UniProtKB/Swiss-Prot annotation:
Keyword entries, A-Z: Aminoacyl-tRNA synthetase, ATP-binding, Cytoplasm, Ligase, Nucleotide-binding, Protein biosynthesis
Entry keyword Metal-binding: no
The gene coding this protein: hisS
GO molecular function: ATP binding; histidine-tRNA ligase activity
UniProt GO BP: histidyl-tRNA aminoacylation; L-histidine biosynthetic process
Protein name: Histidine--tRNA ligase
Organism: Methanococcus maripaludis (strain DSM 14266 / JCM 13030 / NBRC 101832 / S2 / LL)
Disulfide bridges in this chain: none
Amino acid sequence: MFQKPKGTRDFLPEEMKKRKTIEKKLRKVFDSYNFSEINTPTFESFELLSKKTGDEIRTQLFVFRDHGDREMGLRPELTSSVARFYINEFKNTPKPVKLYYFTNCFRYENPQAGRYREFWQMGSELIGSKKPIADAEVVNMAIEGLKEINMDFEIHIGHLGVLKGVFEKYNLSDDEGNEIRRLIDKEDMDGLKSVLSRLESEKNIEISKKVFEVLDLKGGKEVIPILKEKLADFESSVAALENLDSILEFVPHDYVINFGIARGLDYYTGMVFEVYGKKEGAKQVCGGGRYDNLIELFEGEPSPAVGFAYGFDRIMLNIDDFEVENESIFVVPVKSSEMLLKECLKIAKTLRDSGKSVEVDLMGRKLNKALNYANTKNIKKVLIVGENDIRDGKVSLKNMETGEQSLIELKDILNI
């Protein structure tokens, strides 16, 4: 017997209804900010996908060669694809360009709860504005989406420029700075201490104290002036703190300032944020930030950009279970006859034309078995079509929750 590939899932109808319900609510928030939906190819050139993704994600790419011997990969996330799409299609569009997407992505990693080899992301990219209010709009939209689905969460916001300013002050190379960022992202404090100790010995500097002063300070907006004082001699770090302060002026929500957010992707340049669900062990359900150099790196015009993505599967694990109301109507004849079946189809078409979901009995069941079928499908309303009733322009409406049954006029059928 064939089995689904490791790290993938089949979604049953009830699960799909729940996913569609949450998707619809999140789309409503994106649409309310006038973001436009796009989609991109499932696979892109390996060169594009690997250019600025980070070492860990690069090793997780699904890679193949096409019949023209070109190296391709399945998308591990969407930002690189959207940047390429922007260069191809939107570079002459008035700014800002506001785009969103909902699609599947692929990474070859060890499957576990909330982590799969095929997974879904829903996210947005705002391209063309470097103003703090643009960063704030993206943060606010991410927060409001999670509030729309009643998820319990905590958002942490930081700025990569703070630590980058420290690295610059101590003359660290980009590779050395990126190594430190990756260790912070993995929360490998032992590895971080080891690397900092080695750098102190090699360069005769005292960097560890400053790095941990930045990492250890967490809280509300009051931490910004505290850290500005501690980093008064670090000009770039102070500028980053002032930029973050300006962004947070436009964020009227609760948040935790956390400069330990490093993000696993190498293209972020400024403000970054992560959202953690409180239900499943505080796992990350959303992340994003500013990436001002990515489009230029892909040979486009310099274009500031900021965006985020929800891990849709993680979100589904973090919301309380709920039942999606089945609003379908089941139409069944009292007995199997060509005349009654034709009447059932007429009634079904009338209801469908008005936007209702309707199922007609296709099995020729006896009435009791048809009603049992409706119960198993959690259908609340059943229309029973009989010869005498039809001649009188009526049908029976049975409420499957209460068991009540009444005759209604066919002309009133759209009101049920």
